[in-house]
């Protein structure tokens, strides 16, 4: 065998060995909520050091997308920032699936304002009039505010696309089950997109997960009815439930998890996994001590 043939043989052997190693690793498919995608990626990366025989492939697309993938049997774990709807559960069961819900953390669904907005607090009722169909509040002056740089004081309503769990949860918690969003909202693909648009738009108001907050936007203090004290969104107020728009963060499996999927979920709920969700700006499912 000459030198060239030996080199080709060595490369071929390396490729075969790498392929065999990749095939030996168990792949866990994880898809869904844009709110959870960053922490899900952090979990997946950290878990490589825990179990090198497992690879976790993470993608976003929204809670509805992840749930649909679970129903169709194309993922092992569906991330969601809302609970599955009954019609989704029924569809899953009709396809032989048995979705099981797992709470992996909590989030404060924050209301974002431009830095120059003078608003100190907003009530759930005010938000409903801002975002809800037939809501009468369309400009900042109607709630006694004048926002610098906002031409005509007309509100720019920043929302999420309707396959988003954040969209669904805000509708349920703020507008109520029987009320839809008013026309004219700017529906963003991702959580970060909401915050970015609010930062650049003096007239804007938007909602997104607390983990996407930056120093360039303002967080509104939210009250349940306008008469009581408002509560700021934080890890603590999401955890203790005092923030009016706190929500659980969920993962769904098809049936009770077993094997490597169970081991991965158990690790997510361990102190190590919960410290990662805390560092990403979400509330853990219980008190944890982190380095």
What are the roles of these predicted feature ranges?
Residues 1, 19-22:
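Glycine-centered signal
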Residues 1-9:
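Bacterial N-terminal signal peptides that target proteins for export
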Residues 9-18:
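Bacterial N-terminal signal peptides
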Residues 23-107, 112-291:
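Exported/periplasmic ABC-transporter solute-binding proteins
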């Amino acid at each position: 065998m000459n030198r060239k043939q030996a080199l080709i043989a060595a490369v071929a052997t390396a490729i075969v060995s790498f392929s065999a190693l990749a095939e030996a690793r168990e792949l866990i498919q994880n898809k869904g909520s844009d709110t959870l995608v960053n922490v899900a990626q952090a979990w997946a990366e950290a878990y490589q050091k825990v179990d090198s025989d497992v690879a976790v492939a993470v993608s976003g697309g929204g809670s509805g997308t992840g749930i649909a993938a679970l129903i169709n049997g194309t993922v092992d774990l569906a991330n969601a920032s809302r609970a599955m709807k009954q019609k989704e559960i029924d569809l899953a069961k009709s396809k032989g699936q048995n979705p099981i819900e797992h709470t992996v953390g909590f989030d404060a669904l924050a209301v974002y304002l431009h830095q120059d907005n003078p608003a100190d607090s907003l009530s759930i009722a005010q938000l409903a009039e801002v975002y809800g169909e037939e809501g009468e509040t369309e400009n900042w002056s109607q709630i006694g505010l004048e926002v610098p740089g906002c031409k005509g004081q007309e509100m720019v309503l920043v929302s999420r696309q309707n396959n988003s769990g954040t969209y669904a949860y805000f509708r349920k918690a703020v507008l109520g089950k029987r009320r839809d969003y008013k026309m004219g909202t700017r529906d963003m693909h991702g959580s970060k997109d909401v915050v970015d648009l609010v930062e650049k738009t003096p007239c804007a108001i938007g909602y997104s997960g607390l983990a996407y907050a930056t120093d360039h936007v303002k967080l509104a203090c939210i009250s349940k009815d306008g008469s009581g004290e408002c509560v700021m969104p934080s890890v603590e107020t999401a955890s203790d439930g005092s923030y009016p728009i706190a929500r659980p963060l969920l993962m769904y499996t098809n049936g009770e998890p077993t094997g490597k999927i169970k081991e991965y979920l158990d690790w997510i709920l361990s102190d190590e996994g919960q410290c990662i969700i805390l560092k990403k700006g979400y509330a853990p499912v219980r008190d944890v001590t982190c380095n």
